Amino acid sequence: KVCKHMGERIQFDVVKDGDNRTILGCPVTFFDIGSTKAKQFGFTMQLKSGKKFTCVGDEPYNEVDYKYVKGSDWLLHEAFCLFGEADKFKPYEKHHSTVKEACQLAEELGVPNLLLYHTEETHLAERKKLYTEEGQQYYHGNLYVPDDLETFEI
């Protein structure tokens, strides 16, 4: 079903650290996140509004990518579980972070908008509430914990 869209709606493009592309009319720079488990990339996109949107990839932020992340208006960061449940979900073994750590990072970097994603799924009904409550203890910007398929304007 999905394969029929390969090469049309779905396109794969091999990138290297620092490569630039234009996507949806916006300049995008890809960066190697420095993963120790597999080659992975994050990206930063200059939105038409002039805002900078950055995704650090599927692992916690790595300081080697500071030059790409600094000055971001939006940060998309994985937050696998609540800090208090790290013993249960073992995010570090999976190369992931907790809500607390993602929020502390965004606060430290002065990012005004933080969107958390890639979470464990045992708290789906109350995930937004629980993650927001924990996150607001460490981050004082605009915190977004979207439900699956939720959309909003950035």
What is the meaning of each model-derived region?
Residues 60-149:
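Cap/insert and terminal regions of metallo-dependent hydrolase folds
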Residues 1-54, 60, 65, 129-154:
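Binuclear metal-dependent hydrolase catalytic cores
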Residues 54-55, 116:
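Structural beta-sheet core signal
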